[in-house]
Amino acid sequence: MIKQPALVQEQYACVYAWLALLFFREVDDEGLIQLQSAEIADWLALLKRQPALAASVALLEQKIAALSLRQDAQLELAADFCGLFLMTDKKSALPYASQYPQQEPGMIKHLLLEAGMEVNDDFKEPADHLAIYLELLSHLHFSLGESFQQRRMNKLRQKTLSSLLEWLPEFTNNCLKHDPYGFYAALSQLLLAIVRFDDGKEDLSIVAAE
């Protein structure tokens, strides 16, 4: 069997940034078109080459294909997003680290400080939103391409992944339980698979894009 090449830093960075956007705000009409585009299909095909991600990618591909069968797909996705991530009842999957007892309070602020980052004033959500963790991981993977800070950024990447994995499995399980159509459930499963896959790489500072 031919071994597939590992994902490189820039690919991780782009995938994390894409996922951050999808978990931060509702999919609008333009976003729906992009989800169903050849560009996203190519990205998913790239991820699918990794055996650890193949099943999660295949499930998300099925859910994206199913969107074409839903009347008013954009409005229904928006309703799914609102019900899962903006409500506070027991049938939601709130994307905030502080909602999960496993997470040390204020961890994301320490991680951002170490990375020399801060939350933009225009960001109206709490700083421990899932999207902030993913944007941080995206930034760290891009920074790994700069040789003078590889060691420090890789160590911070590992700390961020470990912190995220304290509560991401429960978040994913909540998405599975409460997403009736399954798009965000599939998206969260792919995210969890990617984070676990990334966490399994001890030192990504040696993996460089050609």
UniProtKB/Swiss-Prot annotation:
Q: Does the keyword Chaperone apply?
A: yes
Q: Cellular component terms, GO, for this chain's entry? A: cytoplasm
Judging by the UniProt lineage, the source's domain of life is Bacteria
Q: Where in the cell is it found?
A: Cytoplasm
Functionally, this protein is described as follows: Involved in the biogenesis of TorA. Acts on TorA before the insertion of the molybdenum cofactor and, as a result, probably favors a conformation of the apoenzyme that is competent for acquiring the cofactor.
Family per similarity comment: Belongs to the TorD/DmsD family. TorD subfamily.
Question: What's the name of the protein?
Answer: Chaperone protein TorD
Q: Which organism is it from?
A: Salmonella paratyphi B (strain ATCC BAA-1250 / SPB7)
